[in-house]
Amino acid sequence: MGLLPIWVKNMEKNGIDLKEQKKQLRGEIRKLRKSHTDEEIHQMSLAVLERVQALLEYQEAEVVYAYMDCRHEVETRDLIRLAWKEGKRVAVPRVCGQEMKFYYITSFEDDLEDGSFGIREPKEKNPAYVEDALLLMPGVAFDEKRHRVGYGGGFYDRFLEAHPDLVTIALAFEFQVKEEVPFETFDIRPARVITERRTLT
């Protein structure tokens, strides 16, 4: 029998189940996010943006599925503005019940409204149905094998299961990357994880 991951050993040792492990990790990352200033988050986000911009997958993409950042996630507005400037179409997600759907936006002022979980969401007027788009996704934590811990709603897992041909890149800060994170077999890994310092493939 092979060696068990560290988080499994800790889980068995402490009698903590997978759900509780993820909950504790989310709390840890939330504190780390709050410990950084807005300016620090902005500068680190610009470094992530530069790495995304250099990727062939980004350069060749005609459609980018992005996200509207909140609560000290990797900022996306500068990246979205860049994509618009380069003639790419940009869509962002809207939560519809238990589903997540993407809608095109061409303006932060005209095409967005207050939505679920305090996140700005697109108005339901221009749905996106491109199956080979580049999808930039957030997350709470990742490990060096690209396993992802999300926010617990399962929206991205369900969306990616239904749209397997999307090119997926997760954006994160280095403090969100751990040696190992708890994961389940149905969790879908992004093709790459990009931080301000490196790209995990």
Identify what each model region corresponds to.
Residues I6, E12-A128:
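N-terminal active-site beta-alpha-beta segment that forms phosphate/nucleotide-binding
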